[in-house]
Amino acid sequence: MAKPFKIIGLIGKQKDPRIAESLQQVADFLVAKGLTLMIDQETAALFPSHHWEAVTRHELGQRCDLAIVVGGDGTLLHVARSLADSGIPLLGIKLGRLGFLADVLPEALGTDLAAMLAGHYREEERFLLQAELEQESQSYLIGTALNDITTHIREVVRLIEFETYINGRFLNSQRSDGLVVATPTGSTAYALSAGGPILDVNLNAMVLVSICPHALSNRPLVIDADSLVEIVISEYNTTPGQVSCDGQPGIALKVGDKVKIYKRPGRVRLIHPTAHDHYSILRAKLHWGRKLG
């Protein structure tokens, strides 16, 4: 059994007053257990009359033993990026639809959550990707992603033309709607919708998936996660592109720009109930056939 948690940070889906009731339910449960509760400042805006200590996201990551995230996978992705340097474990209370990352239901607070707070849980680590942009002899860090980093066209439906390099070696040039570079965590997200494979979450790998490529020979490619992926916008490209991390607002790209994608130092810690089974989640969410007999 792991060490029980004592100081809990609570974070909710931003700018969504509908989750106030669920947040209150979780907060009341934690206080009833005699735990110290801190609340994220932005989340605190949903509780004008709250009496808990409101702290910045950074301070929450430094002072708390555990961060409980109330929302869906999108909320947990956002929190994972913002707390990536803290090393704090994350626990997701599922209010969204898919729930690949957040898997504790609000009605299971008295069972699953109580056991996890007492130290009965399973922990796994996921790596993140970092994106860097080289533009006009300048280099910029532009974002972090737990799921994927996507290069694509802005606003209009048109092909983008680019070249891809892996560890400095030319891979290919292509015309497509874009390219998704995904972690194992993100292999069940946009990359899957684009026709990519599902990667085991424990693999040290990432997958490159073309979005609607002009040439059908452009197939998904799984590579070592310690590789450096470079995407260079072709001189023949006529439409502005952009690069996005986990579906966040993108950074504009122009001819000659180079996007570098590589594994970010450090890992995200996720904790789950002891009965957590990733393959069971895949079967349920993707509607796979059950075992016969």
Swiss-Prot record:
EC id: 2.7.1.23
Domain of life of the native organism: Bacteria
Binding of NAD(+), residues: 73-74, 78, 147-148, 158, 175, 177, 188-193, 248
Location of this chain's protein in the cell: Cytoplasm
GO cellular component, one term: cytoplasm
Active-site residues per Swiss-Prot or TrEMBL entry: D73 (proton acceptor)
Keywords: ATP-binding, Cytoplasm, Kinase, NAD, NADP, Nucleotide-binding, Transferase
Cofactor: a divalent metal cation
Catalysed reactions listed for this entry: NAD(+) + ATP = ADP + NADP(+) + H(+)
Main subcellular location: cytoplasm
First-tier enzyme category under EC: transferase
UniProt GO BP: NAD metabolic process; NADP biosynthetic process
Example GO molecular function: NAD binding
SUPFAM superfamilies named in the record: NAD kinase/diacylglycerol kinase-like (SSF111331)
InterPro entries tied to this protein: ATP-NAD_kinase_N, ATP-NAD_kinase_PpnK-typ_C, NAD/diacylglycerol_kinase_sf, NADK
Record function comment: Involved in the regulation of the intracellular balance of NAD and NADP, and is a key enzyme in the biosynthesis of NADP. Catalyzes specifically the phosphorylation on 2'-hydroxyl of the adenosine moiety of NAD to yield NADP.
Protein name: NAD kinase
